[in-house]
Structure formats: structure tokens, C-alpha cells
């Protein structure tokens, strides 16, 4: 979790995320993503929060520091109760969702992206469509859609370093993928180095 010299155990808990919020506030970063692990995953129910997270307390703390909270959500859990999830968390003060694992571009998933954008817009929530295909204009219709993954971002270095020449790929991205629209690259996931002189963790 990259926090040294703190008086708490780092992880998916309020003290860790308060430290992230403090950092964001001090450095003019508008949002902090409460990443995977905040909700009880086995039930795929976004209304069940893990015991180490007091979500309302975090949202209020972030608001006091002029930072918004974005919640990571798996696609299935988000889709199965989208209206209630968006209403509930918007009322709490959450600013948006980062939805993940759509992982395909068929008609059903494209329709899901539109439903998610429309529902989030209805509740004035921003949306990061992570784990989805490249953009095709959805963010023009729904400006609350911040970005789309649709790319082998830096997180790829965690599981496929030998098969990806990330440096070469990154140099090409502005001229290939980036032309189609905003991109969720997941920067910061690993160290930046050329293929010949790094070993991923």
C-alpha cells in the first residue's frame, strides 16, 4: 500500500484511505478511488461494505478536504441493482463509480455502458468505464463519462511483463488508442522502465 511510517496497518480500511485523501487534498487531486475490496465481494452486493470501511465517514472526511470519492464496482454487482446503488451512494455524497470487468464489446455490453452512463447522469455521478472497449462517442452524449480503459494499461506489467513491450506500446498509444477518446491507463501500477532493464514484482 506504499505507506511508510504510519501508526496503522495499511490496507482496505479508513486510516489508509484517509491518508490517500490527505495526499489528494494537499496535491490538488480531485478524486480518490476506493478500489476493489471495499464491498463484500462474495455476494456481489454493493450495499454490503466490509467491516474495516466506514463509507459515510470516509465520504464526509473527503468532502471536508475538497476531495470526492469514486467507488470501484464489478460490472455484475453494479448492473444487478444499478438504480438503487446509484441513488443510495449519490445521496451519501459519493461522486461516481469506476466499473470494471465488462471485457467485451458485444451489443449487450455496449447497451450496459449506455445504461450505466444514463443512470449515473440521472444521479449526477461521474463514471469511469474500466475494463471496457475503446470509446465510440458515449462521452459526447453523456459528459459524466470520464474515460474508458480500452487499452493495455500499466497494470499489465503485473501479470504479462514478458509478452508486452510496454515502452514501445506506450509510445504508440497517443497516435493509436488515444485518438478515439479519453483513456483509463491505470498509471502508477508498476515502475516505469524499458523492457531490458526491469523485473516486475
Model-based region annotation:
Residues 1-64:
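Conserved structural scaffold segments of CAZyme catalytic domains across common CAZy folds
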Residues 36-199:
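Aromatic- and carboxylate-enriched substrate-binding clefts and catalytic-loop regions
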Amino acid at each position: 500500500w506504499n505507506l511508510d511510517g504510519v501508526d496503522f496497518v495499511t490496507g482496505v480500511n479508513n486510516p489508509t484511505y484517509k491518508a490517500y485523501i490527505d495526499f489528494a487534498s494537499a496535491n490538488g487531486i480531485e478524486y480518490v478511488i476506493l478500489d476493489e475490496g471495499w464491498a463484500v465481494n462474495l455476494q456481489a452486493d454493493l450495499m454490503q461494505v466490509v467491516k474495516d470501511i466506514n463509507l459515510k465517514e470516509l465520504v464526509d472526511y473527503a468532502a471536508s478536504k475538497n476531495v470526492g470519492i469514486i467507488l470501484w464496482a464489478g460490472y455484475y454487482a453494479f448492473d444487478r441493482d444499478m438504480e438503487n446503488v446509484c441513488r443510495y451512494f449519490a445521496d451519501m455524497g459519493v461522486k461516481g463509480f469506476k466499473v470494471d470487468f465488462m471485457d467485451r464489446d458485444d451489443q449487450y455490453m455496449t447497451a450496459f455502458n449506455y445504461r450505466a452512463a444514463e443512470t449515473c447522469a440521472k444521479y449526477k455521478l461521474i463514471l469511469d468505464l474500466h475494463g471496457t472497449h475503446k470509446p465510440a462517442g458515449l462521452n459526447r452524449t453523456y459528459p459524466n463519462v470520464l474515460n474508458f480503459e480500452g487499452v493495455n494499461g500499466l497494470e499489465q506489467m503485473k501479470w504479462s511483463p514478458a509478452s508486452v513491450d510496454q515502452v514501445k506500446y506506450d509510445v504508440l498509444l497517443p497516435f493509436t488508442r488515444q485518438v478515439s477518446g479519453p483513456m483509463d491507463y491505470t498509471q502508477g501500477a508498476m515502475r516505469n522502465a524499458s523492457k531490458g532493464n526491469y523485473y516486475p514484482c
